[in-house]
Every structure is written in C-alpha cells, then in structure tokens.
C-alpha cells in the first residue's frame, strides 16, 4: 500500500482548484513543519510561496489548525493524517479539488545492508499478501478512516 500527500485548504476556499501552480506565489502561505516532508515538498514544488514554519516535533494537527484558522492558506498533508483530523474536525479543511496527490510513497521496511536474500523473501511474501487481498483486509480493519491509504493496483484485473 502507499501513503500520499495532498494539498489541503480551508473549507470553501476554491482559489487553487484545478490549478495548484497558483500556490507558488509569495502572497500565499504554506504551513510546514521543519524537517517534516511538507517542508521539502514546499521547497521543491512551491519555492516562491511564503512559509509558516513550525519547529520540528510540532504535531501535524497544528498545520491543519493554521490553515483552518487562516494563518496559512495551504497545508501539505499525508492523506491518512488529514483524514483523521477531518474525522475529529469535520468541515474545517478540504483537499484541493482536481489536484492529484503531490507525492506518493510506497510503504517499505529498512533492512541491514547486504540482506538481499531476506529482502527477496519479504518481497515475495508481501506480493502474495497483496494479491490475495490480505493487505486490503488488514487496512480496512485498522485504518482510522476508511481509504486513507492508497491501495496497490493488481497487475491482472477481471
């Protein structure tokens, strides 16, 4: 399965719908957390935008609150964190309409260098779990909010 980052704005804010490039402007402020992925995405994709930077270790919900309260225009959020925030704070934010995820990350495991045989064994086991539907069942059972993770597309569809 995959984790994805999306752009979130205040509910009712349509300025960036179908044109996220408008965000790359000094008049718009992006809420980021130092050292967190949102700060790297902002620097690479929206370098001209203003930044509301919060210190490392700040809870991600503070980026959400900064947008909801009007201190920032946009937050770059992991879809699963945003879904949990919206479950607890309905109607405060929304994903920018017409925008694909700004980043997609395959969930992986770190292994010791030189563990090629272990890695290959795990790859086969994980593919088997994905193809059998087991991973989807586990995600459905444990996701705080349904569909807050992106599923892997199966190579053969019927």
Language-model features: locations:
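Ligand-binding clefts/hinges and TM-proximal coupling segments of bilobed small-molecule sensing domains
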Residues: 35-52, 93-95, 126-158
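Short helix-initiation/N-cap motifs at beta->coil->alpha
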Residues: 15-18, 52-66
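Short amphipathic alpha-helical coupling segments at ligand-binding clamshell hinges
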Residues: 26, 78, 114-128, 134-138
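Periplasmic-binding protein-like
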Residues: 1-9, 87-126, 145-158
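Short secondary-structure boundary segments
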Residues: 11, 34-35, 79-80
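Flexible hinge/capping segments at coil-to-helix
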Residues: 10-30
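A ligand-binding cleft/hinge motif common to bilobed small-molecule-binding domains
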Residues: 40-44, 68-69, 73-103
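Hydrophobic residues within well-ordered alpha-helices
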Residues: 23, 64-68, 109, 122
């Amino acid at each position: 399965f995959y984790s994805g980052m999306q752009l979130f704005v205040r509910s009712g804010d349509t300025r960036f719908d179908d044109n996220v490039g408008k965000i790359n402007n000094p008049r718009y402020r992006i809420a980021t957390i130092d050292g967190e992925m949102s700060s790297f995405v902002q620097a690479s994709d929206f370098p001209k935008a203003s930044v509301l930077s919060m210190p490392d270790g700040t809870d991600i919900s503070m980026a959400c609150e900064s947008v909801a309260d009007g201190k920032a225009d946009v937050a770059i959020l992991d879809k699963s964190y945003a879904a949990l925030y919206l479950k607890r704070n309905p109607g405060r934010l929304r994903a920018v309409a017409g925008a694909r995820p700004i980043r997609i990350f395959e969930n992986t495991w770190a292994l010791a260098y030189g563990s090629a045989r272990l890695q290959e064994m795990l790859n086969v086991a994980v593919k088997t779990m994905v193809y059998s539907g087991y991973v989807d069942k586990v995600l459905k059972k444990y996701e705080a909010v349904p569909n807050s993770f992106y599923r892997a597309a199966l190579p053969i569809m019927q």
